[in-house]
Amino acid sequence: ASAAQPDAVGAAEEENGLLDFLKKPKYIFLFIGDGMGTAQIQSARFYKGTTENNGAITEGELSFTSFPEVGSVTTYDSTSFCPDSASTATSIATGNKTESGVINMCPWTRDVPYETIAEKLHKQKNYKVGVVSTVNIDHATPAAFYAHQNTRKNYYQIGVELANSGFEYFAGGEFQKVNGDGTGPNNHEVAAQAGYNVVTTQAG
């Protein structure tokens, strides 16, 4: 009986671990270091460790490099080994590859949108969704979680999709073509009409 006890304990721990894994998370955070690959992370670790140890070559620890799990993914897109923010963010947001410059659209037909994980959580699970960026809020990386465009340069249309997304919160740099072609309401007005409280800084 005593010999079997470790197996029983191990099975119980495994079951408890599985149950913890299957629990619905209260919050989900996705952080994207745009253009940050293994080389950039390793350089930052060496810089941090060396500066903290008076110039002695030392590998430092970053807040996320001590996480218990790590993974890696391919970064090429459907047509290029050197992709851009639009296609790579599409892969992160939807699990699908597309062409460089395209946001959440099928690369073969250009008329089939890909649903993002943020949209799925918002519609199917009633999660509240926020998108926060240090770049323009209609830049390809943040836009990949709420927009669907055949070119990342459709900034005004991306801004309209932001307003139509129904997501609860957005924060980032100004819309890049806030007035569009000048024939319709600007992106601030479109967002306000959709119920958003639009707040800008002095810099706009």
Regions found by a protein language model. Name each.
Residues 1-5:
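Sec-dependent, cleavable N-terminal signal peptides
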